Amino acid sequence: MKPDIHPDYHEVAVTCSCGNNFKTRSTYQGSELNVEVCSACHPFFTGKQKIMDTAGQVDKFRRRYGM
C-alpha cells in the first residue's frame, strides 16, 4: 500500500437508539457514532419480521384478472 493516501482507521464507539452500545473500527472521523437501528433491534436479526402473505396476493391477482 502507498503511504499517506489511506484514511485514518480507528476505533469508534457506536450507540443505538435502543440503548445498545458497541465498539468497532471505522474511517468515520468522529469518535462516537449514533445510529437508529442496530443488529440488536433490527427486525431481520431479532426474528420479529413481518412475513408477507404472497399466496393471498396471488389469489387476489387471479380474481381480479379472471385467471
UniProtKB/Swiss-Prot annotation:
Any GO BP annotation: translation
Gene Ontology molecular functions: metal ion binding; rRNA binding; structural constituent of ribosome
GO cellular component: a single term: ribonucleoprotein complex
Subunit structure: Part of the 50S ribosomal subunit.
HAMAP family noted in UniProt: Ribosomal_bL31_1 (MF_00501)
Binding site for Zn(2+): 16, 18, 38, 41
Coiled coil: none
Name recorded for this polypeptide: Large ribosomal subunit protein bL31
Species name: Thioalkalivibrio sulfidiphilus (strain HL-EbGR7)
